[in-house]
Regions:
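Long, structured stretches of catalytic cores involved in phosphate-ester chemistry, encompassing
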Residues: 1-207
């Protein structure tokens, strides 16, 4: 278990009680299945418990949940599609490192869905901007490089994107990432070349 029964009960209770349009759950390690190496410390190693939390969010109709994480040694913007299972698509906003060298390990990884290409050129920081005035609150997320420049087009979410039955991942993903996903679904390498025999086995995650 990643959380243990006391922390998990607290998390579920606070999520259910919150009336905020956006509810941010922060974790030290990534939420996607990408980093599921043996002995790892991300949620990719604790998928049963992770999915229990995601099922709770769906079953209790808790809207507006967004995930943030770090410690992947590269900038990422991933999605765990849950709309095909009666929930909604959960976005993992991941920035790192800030004080170490980045690691180009993305070629060995395939999360459920990449929304933007990984950033491994420089240290980086993620910036979340909430606009709560007006009729439609928005959350925007961008990743910035060592010079403070944005490296992606921002991801912009509204509360309507984060409610049961709403599918948004393919609408918000970069076309390049959708192309890579289609290639992966056909049994080919996600990044255009076949994985090595010693690479972790990560079958296509069917978001339908």
């Amino acid at each position: 278990t990643m959380l243990g029964p006391v922390q998990k009960a607290w998390l579920k209770r606070e999520l259910k009680a919150s009336i905020a349009p956006f509810k941010v759950i922060a974790a030290g390690g990534g939420w996607s299945s990408a980093e599921n190496e043996d002995g790892g410390d991300s949620w990719g190693v604790y998928l049963t418990e992770r999915n229990e939390i995601f099922d709770f969010i769906r079953d209790e109709a808790i809207e507006g949940v967004v995930l943030i994480s770090g410690d992947s040694h590269m900038g990422e913007l991933n999605c765990i599609p849950r709309s095909g299972q009666g929930g909604y698509d959960l976005y993992d906003l991941c920035s790192s490192p800030l004080a170490q060298m980045p690691a180009a390990k993305h070629t060995r990884q395939t999360p459920e869905m990449r929304v933007r290409d990984t950033w491994t050129r420089t240290v980086n920081v993620g910036v979340m901007h909430f606009r709560m005035r007006g009729d439609t609150p928005t959350l925007s997320y961008t990743l910035h490089d060592v010079l403070g420049e944005a490296v992606w087009e921002p991801l912009v979410l509204t509360p309507d994107d984060l409610k049961n039955g709403v599918r948004s991942w393919d609408r918000l993903a970069d076309p390049l990432e959708l192309e890579r996903l289609e290639r992966f679904k056909q049994g080919k390498g996600y990044y255009g070349y076949d994985p090595g025999p010693d690479w972790p086995n990560r079958p296509y995650y069917d978001a339908e």
